[in-house]
Regions:
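Solvent-exposed, well-ordered loop and adjacent helix/strand elements within mature globular domains
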Residues: 1-85
Length: 85
């Protein structure tokens, strides 16, 4: 949190959880290109804006606001992800 780049994605946007719009997710850009819009069952609409060290293959990383307890039910979770056109 003290890092100036904290919360800034690989695409240069600020990471966000938007319950009424598109939230940030991290993806493997070799599988899902950055900028791709997605629908994640149980999470909502998202846009692939970031990457991560543990995000490989069909693994994605959902963004949650710091201090939110929402992540607890998603810590390790399998769900369906739809790529939107």
């Amino acid at each position: 949190p003290g890092d100036r780049g904290f919360g800034i994605t690989a695409t240069g946007t600020k990471a966000r959880r938007d319950l009424h719009g598109y939230s940030t997710v991290a993806v493997d850009p070799n599988v899902i290109p950055l900028g791709t819009k997605l629908y994640v069952e149980g999470y909502g609409y998202a846009i692939a804006e970031d990457t991560g060290g543990a995000v490989r293959g069909n693994i994605i990383d959902l963004y949650f606001e710091p201090g939110s307890n929402e992540f607890k039910r998603w810590f390790t979770h399998n769900t369906t992800v739809y790529i939107l056109k």
